[in-house]
Amino acid sequence: MTSLSSYALTLRGRDYSPLIVGGMGTNISTAELGLAVEKLGGISHLSDAMLMDVSDRLFGTRFTAAKAKRYAGLRDAADKSAELFDLDAVREATIRYISNVMSKTTGRGLMLINCMEKLTMNSGLDTLKTRLNAALDAGIDGITLSAGLHLSSFRLMSEN
């Protein structure tokens, strides 16, 4: 009889169930969905889109409110070139979320994060570097890159 395990995906000598879910979008690939797939030995993706907002909603942090307050004067401005992400806040939100999810994994599957490179705004390289390395520092199993592979992505993670 053919079963799901008959179609195992082997990566680096380890078999995974051919269950692969997740991707882009703010918390569409929720931790609960990802953990269910990982528990079955599959490969799951979380999204790193708007993790400061996700952190605010899940953990009661105030990253989004702080950013809105800091740049309130630019709210109606056409030129938002002075608006930057607080990289310490980006790092803290990413580490908080990923660490929380990774503490609940079983080790049967993989938990990846999908990093949407085009989400960056001003100071894009610094923002991308912070997001990539914070996810790795928090223990994510791997990173997938979408919405445009940044040519510097691997260099940005070279110390990790």
Question: Where is each model-derived feature located?
Answer:
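Active-site entrance/lid segments in N-terminal catalytic domains of soluble metabolic enzymes
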Residues: M1-N160
